[in-house]
Amino acid sequence: MSRIRLGVAALLCVALGATVTAQDKATFALKLEKDKAFYQKMSTTVTQIIKVQGQDLTQKQDSTFFFKWTPDKQDGDKWVVKQKVEGVVMSIDISGNPITYDSTKKDQPGSAGNPGLMDFFKNLDGSEFAVTLNTKDWKVEKVDGKDEFVKKLGAGSTQMDSLLKKIMTDDALKQMADPTYGLIPDGPKAVNDTWEKKQTLNLGPIGSYDVTYKFTYKGKEPGKTLDRIEVAPSLTYKAPTEAADGLLFKIKAGTLESKPLDAGQKPSVVLFNATTGRIESATISLKLKGDLTVTIGGTDTKVELEQTQTTTVDGSNDSLLPGATPATPPTAPAPPKK
């Protein structure tokens, strides 16, 4: 009898231990409500040092996209969410020659030297897509609106239209419409749990990228209720295998690989808000280094490339456009009691 009691007690201890362990695991459930919009601001800073025939060419690019997401309809684990580009801010500096565009301002400085690029930026603003999201594994399964998007961006430029039709693959569009969903764990996690996610981005005649994210759940952010996930991203480039018909160049060969971050780059971190059921903020930083062999006019040219890139994403229940009116006005403080 005593052995039976000990056995029952042991089983109870195991059951209680399992319960405690399950309770200690953080859950990451996306919370969507039909027609209740939420917003994101995605900013990317890229610095490239390109060496060609012994000469260095430095290019800097800053881009900010303002997104509005509106849940439209649900079918089991799948949601169709409407995505709209509410605003675009771009700044490109090629060896001291700046090009800027800001859709949030009425008066644009213009760019007489590259009006086609300015038109491209303008056409990005207001673009809309219907994104089908599987909430079980956080994968974007489908994006509707590609044909209209490519037609809009390529308007007025045969060369741009040809390039976009080749590089704007279904995979490329899915990843463009997926700034944070792929960073969310697809199950409960305990402190110091680790996991991986892999993606392949195929850009047709530009080549493809294999991306690996290694995640570690670190628990609650100190002093906050946000869940902290640290990320170690890595990327490997593969040269294209298909012909670059209609393009002025062809990437014949190349290798690009991730390297340790520069001292000034921010570490990659995701902060998840369990209350809103969305990512509060995310930072993903990369450094790449390698070389490409580019064929132009039948001549092969070796290009050495070093690139640093940092992308930040911020989420909100209100539009993040400058000067936007909050959907829910702040409540005035109660008068002091007499």
Predicted regions and their residues:
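Bacterial N-terminal signal peptides
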Residues: 9-17
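Signature of exported/secreted
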Residues: 23-338
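Bacterial N-terminal signal peptides that target proteins for export
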Residues: 1-9
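Sec/Tat signal peptide C-region and signal peptidase I cleavage site
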Residues: 18-22
